[in-house]
Swiss-Prot record:
Residues that span the membrane, as ranges: 12-29, 47-65, 91-109, 134-153, 164-181, 207-224
Annotated tissue distribution: Erythrocytes and renal tubules.
Annotated protein name in UniProt: Aquaporin-1
Species of provenance: Rattus norvegicus (Rat)
Gene3D superfamilies reported in the protein's UniProt record: Glycerol uptake facilitator protein
Length: 269
């Protein structure tokens, strides 16, 4: 960990996560607010689920392509946790990424709050349970939505695969959009604890907020269990791979590395 923290490239990656997360939350939540200027007194807030889902998915795909070669473009604590459990990043990197992601989400939500201050009852896209949905059901939706996302990340960035064509960022972006199409009517679709955290902090409303951390983290852990130990087990011993948690990857910034266990890279094969 000590050697990793001294590298400029490490801190560039952390800054990249912060900046990309700020842009992601601003663009995606901005689209979810669902109102047009100038505001009219009798205007109703109509949320187009397809528009919002595409905004979330396309923003992830664009930003993953933009900063993937710098940080891996996690942009989601659940994805970061998944890659940590998959022994692809160190504990230090995971902690710093999650902090950067949460701070980025707060900054973006603060900017949105200022821009949309004239909007009455502005929730800033805060996640909560829909009417008639209990906490257990909401938790289940968040688990499933995040599971399919992290499973997609692990599969599309697996260096052992030689059958991949096209764009990994686009595939992951579509997975994010798919998760929103599933979950948006039940929980507002979290599947990203940092995104949920930013809105909750600015609105000072943490009602049912635990669901949007616990659900995605459970879904992420399940995705790693399914992919790394059932669908595509790795040949290297798990105890050896765990060394990455403290030492990091030696070649983690080598974009042309051939190591099948090296860092996730949001880059077309």
């Amino acid at each position: 960990m000590a050697s990793e923290i001294k590298k400029k490239l490490f801190w560039r990656a952390v800054v990249a996560e912060f900046l990309a997360m700020t842009l992601f939350v601003f663009i995606s939540i901005g689209s979810a607010l669902g109102f047009n200027y100038p505001l009219e007194r009798n205007q109703t807030l109509v949320q187009d689920n397809v528009k919002v889902s595409l905004a979330f998915g396309l923003s992830i795909a664009t930003l993953a392509q933009s900063v993937g070669h710098i940080s891996g473009a996690h942009l989601n604590p659940a994805v970061t946790l998944g890659l940590l459990l998959s022994c692809q990043i160190s504990i230090l990197r995971a902690v710093m990424y999650i902090i950067a992601q949460c701070v980025g989400a707060i900054v973006a939500s603060a900017i949105l709050s200022g821009i949309t201050s004239s909007l009455l009852e502005n929730s800033l896209g805060r996640n909560d349970l829909a009417r008639g949905v209990n906490s257990g059901q909401g938790l289940g939706i968040e688990i499933i939505g995040t599971l399919q996302l992290v499973l997609c990340v692990l599969a599309t960035t697996d260096r052992r695969r030689r059958d991949l064509g096209g764009s990994a960022p686009l595939a992951i972006g579509l997975s994010v959009a798919l998760g929103h199409l599933l979950a948006i009517d039940y929980t507002g679709c979290g599947i990203n604890p940092a995104r949920s955290f930013g809105s909750a902090v600015l609105t000072r409303n943490f009602s049912n907020h635990w669901i949007f951390w616990v659900g995605p983290f459970i879904g992420s852990a399940l995705a790693v269990l399914i992919y790394d130990f059932i669908l595509a087990p790795r040949s290297s011993d798990f105890t050896d791979r765990m060394k990455v948690w403290t030492s990091g990857q030696v070649e983690e910034y080598d974009l042309d590395a051939d190591d099948i266990n090296s860092r996730v890279e949001m880059k077309p094969k």
